[in-house]
Amino acid sequence: MTDHELHFFNIVAPEWDSRDTLSKPEIIDRLLTLGGVKECDSILDLGTGTGVLLPYLARRVGACGSITAVDLSEGMLTLAKAKAVTLVPHPQFLQTDFEAQRLPGMYDHIIMYCVYPHLEHPVKTLRRLRRENLQPGGNILIAFPTEASRINAIHHRVRVDHHYLPSPRELTTYLRAHHLPARVLADDAQLYLVAVGG
């Protein structure tokens, strides 16, 4: 993430949730079901933002599970922490650039929700996360609450056209060409979901 992007996310953090009309409960529940997230799982939520996934993750993994939420934006993390005050399990929060810094721990699932186009080195980052942070049999879930064309239109409106999101099929082909085992779990108007690993 560039300094310009970080500044943008810090500025828009207070109004982010009111702008996000796509992250509906039924879509997030479907994401977690298709992604295989279950009770007692350990979750690494990369680019947690304002923590939109956290209540759903906590309900899904329960008290025997664990959640680590990572974001570089202090503004976003402040809101995520406020959202998580009563959650069980209580998430552990890390403010760091996960592309530049190694992360501790091993996880059943690593989730990148609305994150992939912001990665500067996606293949390198996914390889490292899979090698260093993903439990055997686990998945890295790349997800969006709508189709790629709509995400690209949003990025065009806010003048970040270089943040292009390929279709799930295109992304899967690209990742496989770089020796990352990827498969499409959902590709429709309500959910974009690609799994890496497993």
Placement of each model-derived feature along the sequence:
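Conserved class I S-adenosyl-L-methionine
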Residues: 1-36, 56, 79, 148-150, ...
